[in-house]
Amino acid sequence: MNGPYAVVLRYRARQPLAAPVPEAVHAAFLGMVRRADPALAATLHSPQHRFRPYTLALLGPRGGLELRLRLSVLAPDLFREFWKRWERRGGFALRLGRTWLSPAAVQKSGPWCGEIPWPRFWELPPVRRVALAFATPTTFRQGDVDLPLPLPKLLFAGLLAKWNAASSRPLSLDPELFSRFLALTEGRVRIQSVWDGRATIRGFVGVVEFRLKKDAPKEVGQALALLSAFAFFAGAGRHTTHGFGLVRFLHAS
């Protein structure tokens, strides 16, 4: 794969599961990776990564016998050996607390799956308006506090930084341009509080529309299209390896 991708790892338990907290799910995933590919686990823990090269989210419904983990990968080369070992072994078991779950399938199609080669992002035409759906609580760090608001600069400056960390072709753009030329024109959001196993985190969920001002340069429109598509894989805001900031692109014009 020559670009970011997202799959859903499906696991089965022998007895009904209680709804796990995000920290437990994240720990279970890292434990599975450590058993499958120790080198990858060490890389994912490396402090040299300002942004983690993956996101992880537990998809509903929660409880029951099945657990579905949505994994998006921003650095395909890092995970190449992991998938080779997965195929040879038929998957790796997941230990969630004291419960072992068996791998059932790797789902590569569906609403939260997909892939886009890096060059294709650059082929997207510039847009002036975009709508995004935030499926899980999303929050941004500003100073010493979390800010659960879909402010244009916080969202797109964060996506720009993630893009430049993941892609071999950086996007040269001043993040301040998002403050100057991009406006939040419509929003149907609500605040949710989630206990992640360590702290209560507040974030917004819902649908938000952004629109460029008439005098916005063309390169801002191209960045808006590129980063909106990239958000599906990169997630938005903080704690994206713990299920927060799950984003879907809805439409643009």
Put a short name on every predicted segment.
Residues 1-253:
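RNA-interacting cores
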